[in-house]
Structure formats: C-alpha cells, structure tokens
Amino acid sequence: MNDEEMKNALQSLRDRPRVPADRREAAFERVRSEWQAALATQPAIPARTPTRRWALGLAASVMIVLFSGVFFWMSRDTASSHTQIATVLAVHGGNAFRIDDRIYDQQSIKTGPTTLSMRMASGLVVRAAPNSELRFSDEGHLQLEQGRIFVDSNPRESNAPLLVETELGAIRHLGTQYLVEYDRERLNVAVREGVIALQKPAETRSSTTAAAGEQLIVTANAPQAIERSRISATDARWGWVETVASPIDIDGMTLGAFLQWYERETGHRVTLGNADANTRLSGSITGLTPDDALAAIAVAVELTVAQKDDEVVVSKP
C-alpha cells in the first residue's frame, strides 16, 4: 500500500474535528513512519496473490486501530493542556454540541447549523448564531472570525471583562447586552443594554462608545470611519438570540421574577397591570422560547398579554 492509499484509509480519522492541525499532522506522520518500518521488516510476497491483499487489509486495520489510539491520546492531551473557559448552556439545532460540553481556550468553535449559548466562569454569557466561527484565546479574549455573537454581561453579577476581537475592531463591554455581526467586510455592533467601547485596529489609545439603542458600523472599504445609527431593543436582528434563552426554573418563582427574566431575554419593556407580581408559578418552561413561555404562563394563571411596539402589558382579564 502506498502513501496515497494509506491516507485514504485513514482519512475519516485524520479529519476528525477538535484536534489542532499541527498535532493531527504530527500524529499522522508518526503513524506513516511506523507503517513503513513495519512493511520494511516483512518478507517479499508476490504482488498478485490473495495472501498479499489479505495481509495489506489486515495491516490497514491494525494501523487504523493504532491511529485511533493516537487520536484518543491527542484528545486527552488537548483537554488536559488547555484551560476550560466556558460550559455549553443551551443548544438549538444541529448535533455537534451538547449541554454541559466544555469549551477550552484555543478551541476552534464552528457552529454550523447550531445556535449555541456558553456560560463563562464569571457568569458572562456568549451566544453564537449558526454559521459562526470563533475562538477564546483566554478568559478575557474572544476572536470572532465570522458570524454573529451576543454577549450578555449581567450587571447584577461580577462579570470579568471580555474583549471581542475582529480584524475591523475590538469591542469591550461596560455591563451590557450587545450583538456583534462580522463577515470580514463589515463589522456591526448593536447595543441593547448598557455601554460598549469599540476600538479600531490602528487606534490603541482611543475608542468610540455606544449606548443602549445605538449601533456602530465599520467597513473594510473605509476602516477609519464609524457609522452610528439607532436600533430598537426588539429589532428582528435580535430574534435568533431567544432560541437559546438562559434556562430558568419557574417552579415556585413569582410572576414578577419571571417577567424580569422575560424582559432581559427579549428586550421588551413589561408593564404589569392589575396582575399580582407575587403570584407563584409552577411547572416547567424547558424548551420554550421566552414568548412561548409567557403565553403558557398567561394561560396557566389566567392573564392577558397585549403587545404594542416594544412594550408588553400583562394584566388580569
């Protein structure tokens, strides 16, 4: 079996995800060397005999097992030599990620069809939309190669700082919720709550801030110019974020506490009419979007829900 045939036999194992390319190639070359050394010690066998084909098939099987062992070793080594940055909190679509999966520094995250929510040790939550590519350099730096992310830095928690880096600029939060959309040609940062600071690559000592309801746009054609405009907290561009809302256990929770969660997850301002904020809830809303959860609770405790623009009014009938 020549090198090309061996590569084809090992292709599925060689291309498995989440193993750094340099380690994967080093392991492959190691297997290749051991393969050639093993062949060199074997006596010559006539090329056209069934025995040789059987022997090569057996050898290929042995090498696949060997390479599987190398892959397992590399996976264990990768996990043990890196720092855990976050844990998967919620998943929508696809099957590449599962709740409670660990996310490590330097790990390449490609969401594909999946919407993903990750909670960092500090409590800060990062959500990634489908077809996004990102990587945590360490606990304080996230590199967005392309796609969309939503950062939720809850001011009620002691969140550590996070710098989101792209080729068109870097963003840091000052206690906020914000959306970053980046496709290499255009960077858009929209703020739903709090304040962010955008620093362009060429400017290390100055930055441009944006507050809730504002968005900043930078393009590759004019990287030194920043366009500022308004954006609603309930704009359609925020919609994907709600598919991986932060989990909440409503059993025993008050209606008022649930509505606070709803406000933060959707951006809607909630007005409580004649309904009692201390009403105790029961059951579960696992798997429901915030809007569906509110609708289910309204039926359970006999409430009416009316929406007008950015405001949601909850009251007794």
Identify the meaning behind each predicted range.
Residues G69-P317:
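A residue-level detector for the "anchor" residue at the start of short, highly conserved motifs
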Residues A9-S12, A38, A55-G57, V88, ...:
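Acidic/proline-rich low-complexity IDRs
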Residues R14, P43, A60-V62, V70, ...:
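Generic low-complexity, intrinsically disordered sequence content enriched
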Residues D22-L39, R52-I85:
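Single-pass transmembrane signal-anchor helices and their membrane-water interface zones
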Residues M1-I45:
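Short alpha-helical interface segments
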Residues Q36, P43, V62, S246-I248, ...:
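Amphipathic alpha-helical interaction segments
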